Every structure is written in C-alpha cells, then in structure tokens.
C-alpha cells in the first residue's frame, strides 16, 4: 500500500504544525483513551460482531463479512479501512452506473435506497453495526473514537484548502456529522463545516459529548 500522503501541500502542512503545537498533551491523552476504549469494546462486543458477520454471510455467501478499502487519514496518509459489508460484493463496479443519481453535492456519492445495499446491510447501517470492525482501525492508530469520517482518495483529490483542514486530525468512528439530525439531508458544504468546527473546537469535553450522543443515535437506530 502506498505510503505517500494525499491532499496536503507544504503551506497547509506548516499551518497544521503551528495549529497543533499546543495540543501534544491532548493527543497523548486521546490516544491512551482510544486504546483503552477500543480494546474494551472489542472484547465486550465480540459476540455482537460475530453475530453480525454470520448474518452477513448467511444473507449473501458470495463474499466475506468484512471488506477493506483505502481511505485517507491524518496528514493525508492512506490506510486500510475495515467495515462490515453492507453492500453486494461488486458495489464499486456498479458505482459508475449510479453516478447520475447522486443526491449529494461535492465529491461524495450518496443516494437514498442504494440498490447495492443488501437486506442485512440495511439493518446494520441503521443500527451502525457495520462500523464496529473499525474498532480494529482505532486500536491500530489509523483512526480515533472521535474525528471526521475517513474520506476516499478520489474525494480528497477534489478538496480545496478549507476541506483539507479535516485532514489535520485523525479520522474517527463518530463526529458532529455522524450525530447530526437528518445528517444525510445535509449538503457537502454543511458536512465540511461540521468537520472544520470539530477541528477547531476539539477537546476531551467535546469528544465525550459526541461519544454519548453517538450511543443515543445507535440505540434509536438513527444510523445511515
């Protein structure tokens, strides 16, 4: 896998270093928190994850329960992103046929009632169970509990300097956008505004506020 960074030029990189110079204690505490929480969650939720994997394979045995995909992390560094499979195995190949139905402005593709989503996929998306495999990404250090959702390389290639600010921090399992009411009705610009807001406001208090609201979203089945 390529190790070169994507989407961060030298000028933006200098600004990033200045912006984060006073946050070393926060980063150390945040990483410690991520390791502890992800380790505990992997143990406690392992029966749920096993049941999810079995349900996916029973519903569609043509592929495995987890898929990996290259995403862009902090400082534009690519990493292998894991997610419980909620779509048919050839979902990427079918994307070109659906691009004209895209309901999201900007470089992100989203449509309601995506025909590539499987029966089990609809349930695990609504309950956010499809995200549980990313606990491994968090334990590895590719992701954090809280942070902007990791973007695809093709999306980052279209970022301007404003959108690149979301790459200053480690991508996360949940964020302001993830807990926003009717999040899929938000425009791409509104989504980026929420991510930049997090970059500027991030703190332990903000992180825990998002974590608690994420539990509420999952319990109420308000996931995608």
What is the predicted function of each stretch?
Residues 2-9, 66-115, 174-193:
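Short, glycine-rich, amphipathic interfacial segments at transmembrane boundaries or analogous
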Residues 17, 21-91, 209-224:
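A hydrophobic, helix-centered structural microdomain
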Residues 26, 30, 117, 126:
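Active-site alpha-helix of zinc metalloproteases
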Residues 124-134:
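Short acidic-aromatic low-complexity motifs
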């Amino acid at each position: 896998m390529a190790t070169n960074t994507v989407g961060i030029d030298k000028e933006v990189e200098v600004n990033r270093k200045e912006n984060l110079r006073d946050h070393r204690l926060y980063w150390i505490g945040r990483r410690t928190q991520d390791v502890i929480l992800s380790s505990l969650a992997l143990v406690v939720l392992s029966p749920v994850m096993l049941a999810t994997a079995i349900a996916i394979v029973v519903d569609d045995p043509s592929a495995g329960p987890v898929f990996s995909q290259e995403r862009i992390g902090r400082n534009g560094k690519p990493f292998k992103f894991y997610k419980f499979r909620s779509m048919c195995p050839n979902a990427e190949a079918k994307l070109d046929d659906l691009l004209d139905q895209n309901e999201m402005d900007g470089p992100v593709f989203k449509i309601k009632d995506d025909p590539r989503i499987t029966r089990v996929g609809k349930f695990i998306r609504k309950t956010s169970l499809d995200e549980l495999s990313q606990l491994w990404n968090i334990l590895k250090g590719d992701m954090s509990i809280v942070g902007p959702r990791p973007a695809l390389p093709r999306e980052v290639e279209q970022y301007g300097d404003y959108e690149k600010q979301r790459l200053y921090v480690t991508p996360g399992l949940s964020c302001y956008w993830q807990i926003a009411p009717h999040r899929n009705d938000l425009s791409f610009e509104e989504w980026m505004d929420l991510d930049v807001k997090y970059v500027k406001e991030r703190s332990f208090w903000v992180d825990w506020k998002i974590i608690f609201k994420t539990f509420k979203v999952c319990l109420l089945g308000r996931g995608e």
